[in-house]
Curated annotation (Swiss-Prot):
This is Pyruvoyl-dependent arginine decarboxylase 1. The lineage of its organism: Archaea, Methanobacteriati, Methanobacteriota, Archaeoglobi, Archaeoglobales. The keyword ATP-binding does not apply. Its cofactor is pyruvate. One of its GO terms (molecular function) is arginine decarboxylase activity. It catalyses: L-arginine + H(+) = agmatine + CO2. The record marks 40-41 as: Cleavage (non-hydrolytic).
Amino acid sequence: MLPRKVFFTKGVGRHTDPLVSFELALRDAGIEKFNLVTVSSIYPPYCEIVEAEKGLSELFPGQIVFCVMSRMTSNEQGKRIFASVGAAIPPDPSLNGYLTEYHGYCNGEDAGRHAEESAAYMLKTAFEIEPARTFNITVEADVEDCTTVVAAAVFVI
């Protein structure tokens, strides 16, 4: 199973119950209808990056869907949390790239940049090449009740 496409999405959910908070974050990201299976950090060769709407149009409710997901849940009122997925795409499409997850409490650091740089480092050290492109998808939120943030790279097989 080699994914043909990938899209990136993010969401925030708030509720008094952590599980419901997570569900609401998935809804906000548009991926609540799928049975999500998290995988590790490889961006597949020849994988096309598409807009979320296009990727979602090829998926069906209840489908098992693979993704790289960063997730953070907290009930520490007054804190700010983040979730980020960074990507490093190789110049040669026959090579794999890297996706990295990073999450935690905001501390002034550029979380998205950190995830992006981690992915770039993995690509550089795996193939001794510079990435053709790096980017990230990051979500931040102030904690109210129980808050969950999710960022995901979602694969379409």
